[in-house]
Structures are given as structure tokens and as C-alpha cells.
């Protein structure tokens, strides 16, 4: 699609629910009629297994092959190897082979923009590309940030996340300065929120105090729930596994919020083009 938006789901801290957010935001956008490609950019392959491809080591084509193809200037079909999930999202899968790509990228020409080069060949088929980043800053994560139009940051509602957020802001700032000047932060998603405590409110207050003047805190927040943890092993989204749950309703609202933000930006771009 001409106005395809690429979003990196990113946080350098682990355990913040990046993969779950990628799955459920992606399916939520698909439920709104959007064409969505999910990209697994983590050698652990959690996004791939969460969507039902548990034996990801047996996959014949993964993101590693696509990145290698760009480096080798291979002209095979860019759509080959993209998997289609029953909930109307596509997946570029990953497995442990992606770990070796870190070393290959170090010596590659234009090493930070290999993923961007690949996605440029397929993104016109989609409204959204969502990249599930690994919880560390390596060459693959830099490629994800270089390829992205924007970043969504899931933050677990825990005591004072400001230190980790500051490190992430510095990383994004460097990527913007040296690699991708148009990269922006769409917002912070409060995730795994335990509504039985005041911790979520304290976390939100701390985030607003430290970052609220420059970064949006999404109105939607995702509650902690056993069902949300269970669904990761079921190969489907929360919408399919427990459609009437509070978590499904929360992700539905979040997807609508992200989609509405996208429409606002499209209108601004249209106005600027006149």
C-alpha cells in the first residue's frame, strides 16, 4: 500500500510483552480491515512460535534468508517464505539462524539498512508492517529501527521504569541522528497492568512526569491476566482464544487507537502535499 506504515515494537528490557503486543496489535489491525505483515526480528523466534509455527527450525525460509539475499543481491521472489496465519496476518518468521546474521551484518555494505531494503520490496502489499524486536541492541535491532517509520514501546507496569526508558530514548536518538532521521516514537503502551494495585497508576504518573511532554502515553492499557499468558502457547491471538476477555477488549481499543493515529498522520501528509 502507498501509505504503508512500519512500526518497530521495541524495548531493550525483556519481559515487557513485546511479542504479545505484536501479535495482538497485528490481528487487531487486521480485524479493522488492514493488511498486516508481522516481522520476527528475534533469534528466539517467539513471534513465530506464538503464531503456531512451533518447529521454527524446520522452516525453509526465514528473515535470515531475506537479509542474506539482500547482501548477496539475490533476485528471488521477495514474497516467498512469507507465511499466512488464519487470523488474516502475514508473518516473516525467524529462528536461531538469525543469531549468525549479527556477524554477517557487521561486515555488510550499508549494514544498518539491509532490512529496510528488503521491506521496500514487499511493503506496498500492506497497510502495516510490525517488527518484533529482540530485547537488546544489536545489528538486527538497529536494522529494525532503521526500517521503521515509528516505534511503539510496551512498558510493564512496575516500579520506576524511567531508567530503562532513558536508555531506550538515547538509543532511538542515536538512530535518528545517524541512520533514520524520520524515526519517531508513536507512544508508550502500559502492559501487564495489575489493576489490584496502585502500581500501574504510579508507573503511568512516573512516565508522564519524565516523558509525557514529548511522548504519547496510550489511553489503552493491557491488564495482567492468566489467559494472556496462556495464549502464547496456543498459536492464535487473544481474540481467538478468549474473545470476551478484558485483555481482548483492551487490545481491541489499542488497535483502534493506533489505527486512528495512522489516519491522522495520513491526513497531515495529504495536507502537506497540497
Question: What are the functions of these language-model segments?
Answer:
Residues 1-274:
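P-loop NTP-binding core
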Amino acid at each position: 500500500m502507498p501509505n504503508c506504515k512500519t512500526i518497530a515494537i521495541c524495548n531493550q528490557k525483556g519481559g515487557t510483552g513485546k511479542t504479545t503486543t505484536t501479535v495482538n496489535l497485528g490481528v487487531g489491525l487486521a480485524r479493522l480491515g488492514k493488511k498486516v505483515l508481522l516481522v520476527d526480528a528475534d533469534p528466539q523466534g517467539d513471534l513465530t512460535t506464538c503464531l503456531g509455527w512451533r518447529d521454527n527450525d524446520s522452516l525453509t525460509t526465514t528473515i535470515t534468508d531475506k537479509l542474506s539475499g539482500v547482501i548477496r543481491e539475490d533476485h528471488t521472489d521477495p514474497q516467498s517464505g512469507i507465511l499466512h496465519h488464519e487470523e488474516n496476518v502475514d508473518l516473516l518468521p525467524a529462528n536461531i539462524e538469525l543469531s549468525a546474521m549479527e556477524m554477517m551484518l557487521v561486515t555488510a555494505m550499508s549494514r544498518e539498512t539491509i532490512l529496510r531494503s528488503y521491506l521496500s520490496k514487499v511493503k506496498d502489499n500492506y497497510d502495516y508492517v510490525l517488527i518484533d524486536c529482540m530485547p537488546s541492541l544489536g545489528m538486527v535491532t538497529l536494522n529494525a529501527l532503521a526500517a521503521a517509520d515509528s516505534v511503539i514501546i510496551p512498558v510493564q507496569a512496575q516500579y520506576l521504569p524511567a531508567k530503562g526508558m532513558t536508555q531506550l530514548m538515547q538509543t532511538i536518538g542515536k538512530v535518528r541522528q545517524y541512520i533514520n532521521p524520520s524515526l519517531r516514537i508513536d507512544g508508550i503502551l502500559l502492559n501487564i497492568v495489575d489493576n489490584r494495585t496502585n502500581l500501574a497508576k504510579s508507573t503511568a504518573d512516573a512516565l508522564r512526569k519524565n516523558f509525557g511532554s514529548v511522548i504519547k502515553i496510550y489511553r489503552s492499557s493491557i491488564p495482567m491476566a492468566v489467559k494472556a499468558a496462556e495464549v502464547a502457547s496456543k498459536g492464535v491471538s487473544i481474540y481467538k482464544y478468549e474473545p470476551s476477555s478484558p485483555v481482548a477488549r483492551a487490545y481491541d481499543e489499542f488497535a483502534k487507537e493506533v489505527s486512528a493515529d495512522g489516519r491522522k498522520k495520513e491526513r497531515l501528509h495529504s495536507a502537506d502535499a497540497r
